[in-house]
Regions:
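Activation on beta-sandwich/Ig-like modules and their edge loops
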Residues: 4, 10-11, 42-47, 51-57, ...
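Short, surface-exposed beta-strand/beta-hairpin micro-motifs centered on an aromatic residue
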Residues: 10-11, 17-24
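Surface-exposed loops/turns
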Residues: 16, 26-27, 160
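A short, solvent-exposed beta-strand micro-motif common in secreted/extracellular proteins
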Residues: 27-43
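Long, low-complexity intrinsically disordered regions enriched in Ser/Thr, Asp/Glu, Pro/Gly
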Residues: 60-62
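Extracellular interaction modules
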Residues: 65-73
C-alpha cells in the first residue's frame, strides 16, 4: 500500500483467511496493490483433472482508496500466468554529453528468458502504448490497450537465463557522452532514417507507427513509458485502429491490442514529487498492478528501470522477480549497464 502518487509504502501479509491488517496509517488517499504467486505445482493440483501450468499470478489494485477512519473492504484479485520472456531492463532517461547537452539516443530495452526452458520469439512484438494527456478508453481497459509504436522480434530461440538487448542506436555512446554506455553489443537496433546506424547489428522491424515521422525507439525521456510484450501471428496493421475522440484524421491512430495477447507489461510513469498521475496508467492489474518511476520528472539522469533478482539457481541461472507488480519487481538504478544482474540494488533483501 502506498500513499497515492508517492513511493511511501506500507506492507502486510494476509492471514489464512486472506485478511491483511495495516496499523497506524495516516489519513490520506492510498493506492493498494496485492500480489500473490501460486506455484505451478499447487495450481495444477487445484483443478480437475490436474494440469501442467506455469506459476499463476494473482493481482489486484485499488488506486483511490480514501482512508480517514477505520476501514474494512474486499479486493477481488485477477489471475494471470507467469510468462517466460519478460522485460528485464528499460533505459529511457538519457544523460548529458561531454558539453553538458541533453543526450537521449542511448536508450535501450532488455528482454530476458526467465524460465528453465528454451523459448521462441516467433510472432512476439514489443509495443509502446499511447500516452495521451487525457485517458479516453477507461471502460475498455480490462479488454484492450492501445499502441503508438510496435516492433516485431525476429524469430530465434532464446536459452534459459539469456537476454535480448535492443538499442535505439547500437553505437558506442561514450565517445560523445562519457557517462553513457557502449551499445555496439546490442542484438538489434531500431534503424531510424537519417540517424547513425551500426551495419553490424540486425534491424528490429518497426512494423507500426502511429505517426510516420516517428521512426525511432520513441520513449519519453522523463516518462511515462508503458511497454508490453505480446504475441500475434498476423499482421498488426490489420488490427483495429482508433483515434482519440475529436482527433483530426491526420492525427495519431493507435492499434488496439487485446489484453489476452499480452505476455508482459511494465508501467513507467512520470515522477512527480507531489503526486504521481495515476490516470496515465494504461494496464489492468493482471498485467501490472502498479508502476515504477525515475527519481526526477525531467530525465537526463542516467537512470534505468531494472528488474530485481528473485534467486540464483544451483547452476548459476538468475531468476528475476516477476509478480506483475512493478513497484515490487523493479528498482530505479543509476547503474545503466545492460546484461548485468549482480548489481547490489537488484539482489534479494
Amino acid at each position: 500500500m502506498t500513499i497515492r502518487g508517492s513511493k511511501n509504502s506500507y506492507k502486510a501479509v494476509t492471514d489464512e483467511e486472506g485478511v491483511a491488517v495495516f496499523q497506524d496509517l495516516l489519513p490520506d488517499v492510498y493506492s493498494l496493490a496485492v500480489s500473490y504467486v501460486l506455484p505451478r505445482e499447487e495450481y495444477g493440483n487445484m483443478v480437475n483433472p490436474p494440469i501442467e501450468a506455469n506459476d499463476v499470478l494473482l493481482n489486484g489494485t485499488l488506486p483511490n482508496l480514501r482512508i480517514y477512519e477505520n476501514y474494512n473492504g474486499e479486493l477481488t484479485l485477477q489471475m494471470g500466468v507467469r510468462q517466460s520472456l519478460i522485460f528485464s531492463k528499460i533505459y529511457y532517461s538519457g544523460t548529458k554529453n561531454a558539453n553538458n547537452k541533453n543526450y537521449d539516443v542511448d536508450q535501450y530495452i532488455e528482454l530476458y528468458n526467465n524460465s528453465d526452458q528454451t523459448v521462441s520469439t516467433e510472432n512476439i512484438h514489443i509495443a509502446l502504448l499511447e500516452t495521451e494527456s487525457t485517458p479516453w478508453f477507461v471502460e475498455e481497459k480490462e479488454q484492450y490497450i492501445y499502441a503508438k509504436d510496435i516492433f516485431k522480434l525476429p524469430t530465434r530461440d532464446l536459452e534459459p537465463g539469456k537476454s535480448i538487448l535492443i538499442a535505439r542506436q547500437a553505437i558506442d555512446h561514450t565517445i560523445d557522452a562519457p557517462l553513457s554506455l557502449d551499445l555496439t553489443i546490442a542484438d538489434y537496433e531500431v534503424k531510424a532514417v537519417n540517424k547513425p546506424q551500426n551495419s553490424q547489428v540486425e534491424q528490429l522491424p518497426h512494423v507500426y507507427k502511429s505517426l510516420a515521422t516517428l521512426d525511432w525507439l520513441n520513449m519519453v525521456v522523463g516518462g511515462g513509458n508503458q511497454l508490453v510484450l505480446f504475441r500475434y501471428d498476423g499482421d498488426v496493421n490489420d488490427l483495429t485502429k482508433k483515434q482519440k475522440p475529436d482527433a483530426k484524421p491526420s492525427h495519431a491512430w493507435y492499434v488496439q491490442i487485446a489484453t489476452s495477447m499480452v505476455l508482459d507489461g511494465v508501467e513507467c510513469l512520470k515522477y512527480n514529487a507531489q503526486e504521481i498521475d495515476l490516470s496515465k496508467k494504461r494496464m489492468p492489474a493482471r498485467i501490472d498492478a502498479s508502476y515504477q518511476t525515475l527519481s526526477t520528472a525531467s530525465g537526463r539522469t542516467g537512470e534505468s528501470i531494472e528488474r530485481k533478482v528473485a534467486r540464483v539457481e544451483e547452476d548459476g541461472r538468475v531468476v528475476l522477480q516477476d509478480t506483475n507488480n512493478s513497484l515490487e519487481d523493479f528498482v530505479c538504478t543509476s547503474d545503466i549497464r545492460p546484461l548485468i544482474y549482480t548489481k547490489p540494488e537488484l539482489q534479494p533483501q
